[in-house]
Amino acid sequence: MISTSARGSHELDVDVVIVGAGPAGLTAGYLLTKAGKSVAIIEKDQTYVGGISRTVEHEGYRFDIGGHRFFSKSQQVVDLWNEILPDDFIQRPRMSRIYYEGKFYSYPLRAFEALRNLGLWRSAQCMASYLQYKLFPIRKVTSFEDWTTNQFGKKLYSIFFKTYTEKVWGMPCDEMSADWAAQRIKGLSLWGAVVDGLKRSLGLNKLNDGTGKQAKTLLETFRYPRLGPGMMWDAARDKIVATGKGQVLMGHALGQLASDGQGGWRLRADGPEGETIITARHAISSAPMRELATRLHPLPATTLQASNLKYRDFLTVALMIRSDDLFPDNWIYIHDSKVQVGRVQNFRSWSPEMVPDQDIACVGLEYFCFEGDGLWTSSDEHLIAQAKREMDILGLCKPEDVVGGAVVRQEKAYPVYDETYAENVEAMRAELAERFPTLHLVGRNGMHRYNNQDHAMMTAMLTVENILAGEQVYDTWCVNEDAEYHEAGDEGAETTLPARETRALSEDQAAALASVRDVPARVDKAPDTRNETERKVA
């Protein structure tokens, strides 16, 4: 219910207040209102819901911020997508390539194409390096470089992983935790890529063959909303509001989230018409943990740890080009160090309805940066000029063919996995769970996990189950805990929610569960203890 106080601020009282209208926040809001709970969602963006999964529109052109395939092994997630957006999915072919030294490589690699492009001598070096690391692997795997070198060999790692990865994260690969590699490319290896490339080259590859073993990059098609991922989240917002139980307050930033000392919450949101006060029995936050810590009252004891969490930011420069489509790919990965762009999207390849003019090609150049650095603070005009220049360097288009451009910035797009992130996250998680059991953290930034859209949704789904049950039935932090990339195997293959342990684990049970992780979570700065042979190979 909405009221206006004597001081002029708006006041609401709801069952649940939600910070952030991204996939996690809107999933929670949709399921809660469907169950009859009253909900208020605050979103600091004045125009768009969906967070990093939003779709931005500019003069009729639609831009997907980062590219979002709709695939999940969770049948509950698939069913929810279909429930929210029943009639607007299209099936799209998947095509991505790597650009390296002026040549394009299919991704996944095609064996014969890679041999032709790399040449016999370099290909032989790649295979020799791969065999060396299979015979003498790095035993103490701590960094992205260690993990990927063990999987592919040093030579192939340096060609196809190092440059692009360092563009994405802005740090050397040997300083980056192995978590990212384990999550995003687990299940792939040089041998697997070669075998799959041979099958593809000979026409023997099967699409989603039901084995549940296909790794993420081997999927051939995907579903996609015809007007971009934002179409899904616009629909979720509209359904929340249509119930009469939910409100989505746009342009409202989190000012303070205060505990009332009795398990309830008082949230202050700063909006275009002043402040809004929302009281609620439960609070769900998808805000970055670092940001949440400074706005909680009383302040958490772990605020310092939260302040040390880091993020990688992101911007897209969309160019409208008078041309046929420049390439058929959904996107191409730019491994060339001569340009700053990391990836180039072809928006029409995602959906023809994203580009209104058939005579115009529309692409998005993706740049990875830190908020406040030279790229982030550059003017839109400068960024558009840089994008035109780099497209020319790559040989994809001439600057004079560009007829329009737009820039979209996304802060805190990626939570950074550095040496201390795991202990910082765990410290804050443990404190909040003990002190504030009615405060629930969900989503990518809410949990500081580099999760996909369906993972973010699942954390919200589990949280809603807990709220409706009145107790913690499920452990939301177990979602994707094994660092296995979720987009693998058959869509909808998993049909049940993971059950939470109801008893405390014994010490040896906890140790056994911890042993399933193949790589440590943080970079270990201990002295190099590898044997002499391993050091020579490295």
Model-found features: residue ranges?
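A short, basic/flexible loop-to-alpha-helix module at the beginning of a structural domain
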Residues: 1-13
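Dinucleotide-binding Rossmann-like beta1-alpha1 core, especially the glycine-rich loop
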Residues: 59-136, 186
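Glycine-rich FAD pyrophosphate-binding loop
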Residues: 33-57
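Mid-domain catalytic core of redox enzymes
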Residues: 11-12, 225, 250-396, 400, ...
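N-terminal Rossmann-like FAD-binding beta1-loop-alpha1 element of flavoenzymes
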Residues: 14-41
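C-terminal lid/capping helical subdomain adjacent to the catalytic/cofactor pocket in oxidative enzymes
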Residues: 6, 419-538
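Active-site/ligand-binding neighborhood in enzyme catalytic cores
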Residues: 125-257, 265
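Flavin (FAD/FMN) cofactor-binding core of flavoprotein oxidoreductases
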Residues: 384-388, 392-433, 440-441, 484-485
